[in-house]
Regions:
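N-proximal helix/coil linker or "cap" segments that precede and/or mark the start of modular domains
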Residues: 28-53, 123-127
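Short active-site neighborhood of thiol/selenol oxidoreductases, capturing the structured segment around
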Residues: 66-88
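Structural microenvironment flanking redox-active thiols in thiol-disulfide oxidoreductases
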Residues: 88-131, 142-148
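Terminal, non-catalytic domain-edge segments
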Residues: 192-195, 314, 357, 363-369, ...
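Extended ligand-binding clefts on enzyme/binding-domain cores
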Residues: 192-198, 219-222, 257-261, 269, ...
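N-terminal carbohydrate-binding/catalytic regions of secreted carbohydrate-active enzymes
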Residues: 193-263, 368, 378, 408, ...
Length: 472
């Protein structure tokens, strides 16, 4: 999230990582973590889509109390301390922020104080709120059990719950403007995909149904188009899918096997479009699978196994699966080679494009064939120094591609969903959203900043993640 981080947050992060300055931020061994998300100030023990792991607090009289959620009510919870400059800054903006709540039918906002008994007590925190004229419902985390259970690493941290009490969004930054708060509430209430879709439709989607690689670009991205079609199906957006159906009717093929298979999968999933899917399927078989087998140079990421199943005997599913599985690089770097020469039976051992490799893993995960070694490697990267755009086949980062993109984390999140890895999913979404603009006052609201030249791929990959999230 693109929001302000100041000295208080840096101090808190240093304390949590190095376990120094214990008076400022008491960190137990179980709460301390070296997870990469912590460098972005995210909690380390709170899962998206799950209920709060702990809800035992105290009221201003020291009596047991809980965060209470009414029917159809969304709940903001801000974890804070009276000595924290960033908390003071956020709370000073409440006069501008609170009117935003009135724009929505049923939203409440709790403050939960970090009551360690040293830097803050119920008495000092209550006195601070009274002095500042803050009347939001306030509870107190005596002994820091709430903080430790959620793995909160810095303050303020704001968590947004849906009416079922499940975590929708975590904002570990200082909220200072109505646009930032409104973007958070829109994310939860209107859907995580809402603002991103609006950005894509306004800036990237052509009337024909094709997708621009970037705002203002004249070059299109069939890869993004395939993802967008899949998103349309999963989000039940018929009008958006219709644009893809019309494009296929007018153009026949993207000219790329993987993207054609993605469109086939989308059209096949929608009742009434079976004829369109059959026509596209015939085109795919005739274009790419002469004699019922793979031919020429094949990108492993194009072998969408789930969609190939739809083609029956016309597609060499077994051969494709075998080619992918034999393209496994090895235990030390458990991803897959990028290309296979079907005529020579050899793999290209050159640099690995991580987005392509993760797309291959996603296709394996969709048919239940993902390796545990690969999942473990993804955990290591997501919890370590993050994923990078390209690697050598020895697993070394290519110097000129030593950067992250939101699509890498979107693809990892999709893999995690298919594999049932909730923690990997949460961390991947958090890292993906460090690149997202949360501000309704910005023309870029909902979009993802990326160094990928195909910016649309990042936007549409995130959309697909959001659609899958809503299905869970």
């Amino acid at each position: 999230m693109k929001m302000k981080k100041t000295l208080c947050r840096v101090l808190c992060a240093v304390c949590a990582l190095a376990m120094v300055l214990p008076v400022i931020f008491s960190v137990t061994a179980s709460a301390a973590s070296t997870k990469y998300i912590q460098s972005y100030y995210y909690p380390t023990k709170t899962l998206i889509g799950e209920e709060l792991p702990y809800n035992q607090l105290s009221d201003q009289n020291g009596n047991p109390a809980q965060i209470e959620i009414g029917e159809n009510q969304y709940t903001l919870i801000t974890y804070w301390a009276s000595w924290c400059p960033d908390c003071e800054e956020e709370l000073s903006h409440l006069p501008e922020l609170l009117p935003v709540l009135d724009e929505y039918e049923n939203v409440q906002w709790y403050l939960v104080n970090r009551t360690d008994g040293v830097d803050d007590t119920i008495a000092t925190a209550s006195a601070y709120l009274k002095e500042q004229g803050i009347t939001l419902p306030s509870l107190y985390d005596e002994g820091l059990a709430f903080r430790n259970a959620l793995g909160i690493n810095s303050i303020p941290t704001t968590i947004l719950l849906n009416p079922e009490g499940e975590v929708e969004l975590i904002n570990p930054n200082v909220i200072t403007t109505p646009g930032q708060l409104r973007a958070m509430l829109d994310y939860a209430i209107n859907g995580a995909d809402s603002a991103t879709l609006s950005y894509v439709q306004a800036n990237l989607l052509n009337e024909s149904g094709s997708v621009k690689r970037a705002a203002g670009s004249t070059t299109t991205s069939s890869a993004a188009q395939g993802l967008l079609a899949q998103y349309a199906v999963d989000s039940l957006n018929k009008s958006l899918l219709d644009t893809q159906r019309q494009w296929v009717f007018a153009n026949g093929s993207t000219g790329n096997l993987g993207d054609d298979l993605a469109l086939l999968g989308a059209l096949s999933s929608w009742r009434g479009y079976e004829g369109d899917a059959a026509t596209l399927g015939e085109t795919i078989v005739n274009t790419y699978f002469a004699d019922g087998q793979l031919n020429g140079q094949v990108s492993l990421s194009d072998l969408d196994l789930e969609s190939m199943m739809l083609l029956g005997r016309g597609a060499p599913y077994d051969e494709a699966l075998s080619v992918i599985q034999k393209g496994f690089i090895g235990a030390q770097f458990p991803l897959y080679y990028s290309e296979y020469n079907a005529d020579k039976g050899t793999y290209n051992h050159q640099v690995i494009d991580t987005a392509d490799a993760l797309t291959t893993v996603y296709h394996l995960a969709q048919v239940g064939k993902v390796r545990k070694q690969t999942i473990n490697w993804l955990y290591d990267q997501v919890e370590g120094d993050g994923l990078r755009a390209r690697y050598t086949t020895d697993g070394e980062v290519v110097a000129t591609y030593n950067y992250e993109t939101p699509a890498l984390y979107a693809l990892t999140a999709l893999i995690a969903l298919e594999a049932g890895e909730e923690d990997l999913f949460t961390q991947s979404v958090m890292l993906m959203e460090t690149c997202r603009t949360f501000d309704t006052a910005s023309a870029s609201n909902g979009s993802f900043t990326t160094r990928n030249k195909d910016s649309a791929f990042d936007q549409c990959a995130a959309l697909l993640v959001y659609a899958k999230m809503q299905q869970e």
